[in-house]
Amino acid sequence: ISECLVGSEMCIRDRLTLSDKCYRAELVLGMTTDTQDADGEVLTECEVTCSEDEIRQAIMSFVGEIEQIPPMYSALKVNGKKLYELARQGVEIERKPRIVEIHHIRIEEIALPYVTFTVGCSKGTYIRTLCADIGDKLGCGALMESLVRTRVGTFPIEEALKLSQVEELVREGHLEERVIAPDAVFEEYEAITALPEADKALSNGNKLYFGQVRAVRKRFADGEWV
């Protein structure tokens, strides 16, 4: 699932980028690669001897705030160069760990060496790194076999359209009926009612001052989205 913004809706792109994500992933135990997924060069292989209970405990131990070291094969930039560009040149540099949050994990199936699970997480979480870290914790290594993003913010994959469906809607003249209003991005947040005289300032992206507020339903913390 990937969002598609049109026209003035591009201004909320950063908000979607900051949204939590949900994924369905399959990992393979007993194997590691240089990319942490099935497309990379195999680095190690070993027999998987851990039990299902040990696997479950290891996976669930990652729920909450954790530190992750971004993989070399990623689009993060260092000194203007993307890490994956450096990795392809055989260059590996030190990456600082980052704090991410795993909100929940549900283990769907264990059919060794494969484990399928769903995960909800904060922005900036690398699921293939999570798979690799799970393998490290179990002592046998692991890689990510497959990944599907199933939710972005409040938008589930069930509401997504395939490109072929979009093309058909365009031909039939019904595409606008399926376009979601940008307000939907903010449905998960508390609302503030502003006075009419603040409309122009807000539409131009300016700050809202307390004297321009008509109604507030709760007290907000510094930095909280509304």
Predicted features along the sequence, with ranges:
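Residue-level signal for inorganic ion chemistry
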Residues: 4, 25, 80, 130, ...
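Accessory RNA 3′-end/elbow-binding domains used by RNA modification enzymes
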Residues: 19, 53, 137, 141-226
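A structural signal for short, well-ordered beta-strand segments
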Residues: 25-27, 105, 117, 147
